[in-house]
Amino acid sequence: MALRPSKGDGSAGRWDRGAGKADFNAKRKKKVAEIHQALNSDPIDLAALRRMAISEGGLLTDEIRCQVWPKLLNVNTSEPPPVSRKDLRDMSKDYQQVLLDVRRSLRRFPPGMPDEQREGLQEELIDIILLVLDRNPQLHYYQGYHDIVVTFLLVVGERLATSLVEKLSTHHLRDFMDPTMDNTKHILNYLMPIIDQVSPELHDFMQSAEVGTIFALSWLITWFGHVLMDFRHVVRLYDFFLACHPLMPIYFAAVIVLYREQEVLDCDCDMASVHHLLSQIPQDLPYETLISRAGDLFVQFPPSELAREAAAQQEAERTAASTFKDFELASTQQRPDMVLRQRFRGLLRPEARTKDVLTKPRTNRFVKLAVMGLTVALGAAALAVVKSALEWAPKFQLQLFP
């Protein structure tokens, strides 16, 4: 069964609506105090900061984010930031593409911002991107990367954004910055197994429509920055993602699809109709509810379980991309995700999977937050599941952008 849509204006839950002003202010004040207490602890209480970032309302203000985001990414703010070289624009092979993307990013800046200020920020955005790429030649620019960088720039400023983006690019975003889209494609392949765990009916409908997962590509590689119009919702998601496992964005993508289950099932069962519907992401989503449910699914169906299942399926059958001819056809028809089309249909589904997974007793909140944040606390080990999964997965030549 789906995550049923509920009425709401899409704001950040009870922090913005539904409670009296006095109650709201009291909760906010209490949370701010808890965040500062965690920051002032010796050593800093990172587990508490992760809980604050994940829990309802997130980190609340950009001022707090300037203090907490570096801690979540283990960036030492006392160290001098990287210094941009004046000749980078002349030397960088990516400069022209970065320039085009940044020029198209007008809507990512606050409405009403003076042109002069916006243009100055766009220049800073270009400098940050080129500097990170120059310092890390193993990284490759992709269209959509600027949508993530501009979020950090607007929240923490150029100096701190450079350090944060560099750390993020070598960790959470690392798979997106390979020479090809192979690893990105593999991460997208987690989407359908997650959906299948909650709603086999929706999963089978989408498989019959052969819609694939391309509709979620821009969600994943921009952390939803490219598709959400309200900057408050973007930074709220960044609070969540920075405090969690690198695969959490794909879980959030799954709960969006599940939330819209009835809309999808009411569509014509063909690729064009379903792709069009899912590509148009609603702006009034109940973000706090979806964040909580994404966390529930992560705990109930961790990446290691889904990765092994997907890997076994990939070994069991050939895919549309396994030969050049089939790959060419799949790319032309925008149906590249055939890896999980038949997921061991001979195996019996447990009875419980026909029920709504999310009707089970809710996971203890503190246990759930601890599990979601655990891999982040382990630093480089946070990517171990992803890396091991990629070792099992076959490689696909799939170039999605010009």
Swiss-Prot record:
The record marks Q143 as: Glutamine finger. Keywords: Disease variant, GTPase activation, Membrane, Transmembrane, Transmembrane helix. It is found in: Membrane. SMART domains: TBC. The chain crosses the membrane at residues 237-257, 366-386. The record marks R104 as: Arginine finger. Pfam families: RabGAP-TBC (PF00566). GO terms for biological process: acrosome assembly; camera-type eye development; COPII-coated vesicle cargo loading; Golgi organization; lens development in camera-type eye; lens fiber cell morphogenesis; lipid droplet organization; male gonad development. One of its GO terms (cellular component) is nuclear membrane. GO terms for molecular function: GTPase activator activity; small GTPase binding. Residues 1-27 are annotated as: Disordered. Residues 59-245 form the Rab-GAP TBC domain. Residues 14-26 have a biased composition (Basic and acidic residues). It is a multi-pass membrane protein. GTPase-activating protein specific for Rab1 and Rab2 small GTPase families for which it can accelerate the intrinsic GTP hydrolysis rate by more than five orders of magnitude. Also shows GAP activity for RAB18 GTPase. Promotes RAB18 dissociation from the endoplasmic reticulum (ER) membrane into the cytosol, probably through stimulating RAB18 GTP-hydrolysis. Involved in maintaining endoplasmic reticulum structure. It is linked to Defects in Tbc1d20 are the cause of spontaneous autosomal recessive blind sterile (bs) phenotype. Bs animals exhibit embryonic non-progressive nuclear cataracts and spermatid abnormalities associated with male infertility. The arginine and glutamine fingers are critical for the GTPase-activating mechanism, they pull out Rab's 'switch 2' glutamine and insert in Rab's active site. This is TBC1 domain family member 20. It comes from Mus musculus. The lineage of its organism: Eukaryota, Metazoa, Chordata, Craniata, Vertebrata.
